[in-house]
């Protein structure tokens, strides 16, 4: 039974790591333009729902501390604000889901993962 519990714990840890890492996302970065529908600053990471021309997207930000260090807090934007997101979208093309490396709200550009931003 202990062996089974260890296997389950290991698999759950791997799934959490895969989700919070980058392995679930494309290598190429994509730009998404839209309007913020909602903002959640809850752990494990803040999430924006963004209404774009092709539907509602889930945009994952960094962990709460990292997101705040980038300059983004729950007061930085509101529903209805225009946003441009640079990030890596899900490998699953049918999902409107991406992880942001940079967001621009109005004139304010915030780099969540500056080391991951690819120069074109």
What does each model-found stretch correspond to?
Residues 42-51:
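Short aromatic-glycine-enriched beta-strand elements
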Residues 1-4:
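Positively charged n-region of N-terminal signal peptides that target proteins for export
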Residues 90-114:
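OB-fold/S1-family single-stranded nucleic acid-binding modules
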Residues 69-84:
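Short nucleic-acid-contacting surface segments enriched for D/E, G, S/T with interspersed K/R
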Residues 22-39:
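Short, glycine/small-residue-enriched coil/turn segments at secondary-structure junctions
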Residues 55-64:
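A short macromolecule-binding patch
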């Amino acid at each position: 039974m202990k062996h089974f519990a260890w296997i389950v714990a290991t698999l759950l840890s791997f799934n959490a790591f895969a989700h919070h890492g980058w392995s679930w996302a494309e290598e190429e970065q994509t730009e998404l333009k839209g309007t913020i529908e909602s903002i959640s600053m809850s752990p494990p990471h803040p999430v924006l729902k963004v209404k774009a021309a092709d539907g509602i997207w889930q945009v994952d930000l960094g962990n709460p501390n990292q997101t705040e260090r980038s300059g983004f807090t729950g007061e930085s934007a509101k529903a209805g604000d225009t946003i441009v997101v640079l990030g890596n979208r899900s490998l699953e093309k049918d999902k409107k889901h991406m992880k942001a490396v940079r967001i621009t709200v109005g004139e304010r550009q915030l780099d969540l993962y500056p080391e991951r931003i690819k120069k074109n």
